[in-house]
């Protein structure tokens, strides 16, 4: 029903993967949307959306924003969405528990949210950890390992630069992501947020 609705209303190519139980113990549906299927002159651009079967603790009514000025018929649409604070908590928890690797978008998103003045809601972190069927002790242990890898493993920075090149304009990549000083800034900010998260009781 979701696929048919998105395809009919917006003319987008959409696929949905059946839920899989990831190592976080959470059922996750993978939604993939090709944004401009009619543009054969451009590389295929996909938006990947994970829909997880976990509760949102800090929902707020939000108006759907149209950053690109394209009329999608969604003007004025109000949705219940997670607060940015809860999204930041999710990103820090994902940094600790995501299977097999550090996801570069988590690093970028943590920095972006902090640049928007968002504070990590420490009171919410234990509930989010519990939603993922882990303990606070496991969170601290895993996060410590991931934070130490940020500077200890040069491949982490190389992977980050490579992935961000896919999402950001070339000038932004040259002026920020490719600069050693940006990596130092980013890792210090992420380590600082991680240290704050590990103070929970």
What are these regions (language model features)?
Residues 1-201:
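Structured mid-to-C-terminal alpha-helical surface segments
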């Amino acid at each position: 029903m979701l696929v048919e609705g998105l395809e009919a209303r917006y003319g987008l190519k959409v696929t949905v993967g059946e839920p899989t139980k990831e190592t976080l113990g959470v059922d996750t549906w993978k939604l993939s949307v090709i944004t401009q299927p009619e543009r054969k002159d451009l590389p295929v651009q996909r938006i990947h959306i994970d829909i997880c079967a976990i509760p949102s603790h800090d929902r707020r009514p939000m108006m759907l924003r149209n950053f690109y000025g394209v009329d999608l018929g969604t003007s004025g649409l109000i949705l219940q969405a997670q607060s940015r604070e809860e999204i930041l908590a999710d990103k820090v928890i994902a940094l600790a528990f995501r299977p097999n690797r550090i996801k570069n978008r988590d690093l970028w998103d943590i920095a972006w949210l902090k640049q928007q003045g968002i504070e990590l809601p420490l009171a919410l972190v234990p509930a989010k950890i519990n939603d993922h069927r882990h303990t606070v002790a496991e969170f601290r242990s895993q996060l410590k390992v991931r934070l130490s890898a940020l500077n200890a493993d040069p491949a982490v920075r190389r992977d980050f630069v490579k992935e961000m090149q896919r999402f950001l304009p070339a000038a932004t990549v040259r002026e920020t992501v490719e600069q050693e000083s940006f990596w130092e800034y980013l890792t210090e900010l992420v380590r600082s947020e991680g240290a704050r998260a590990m103070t929970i009781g």
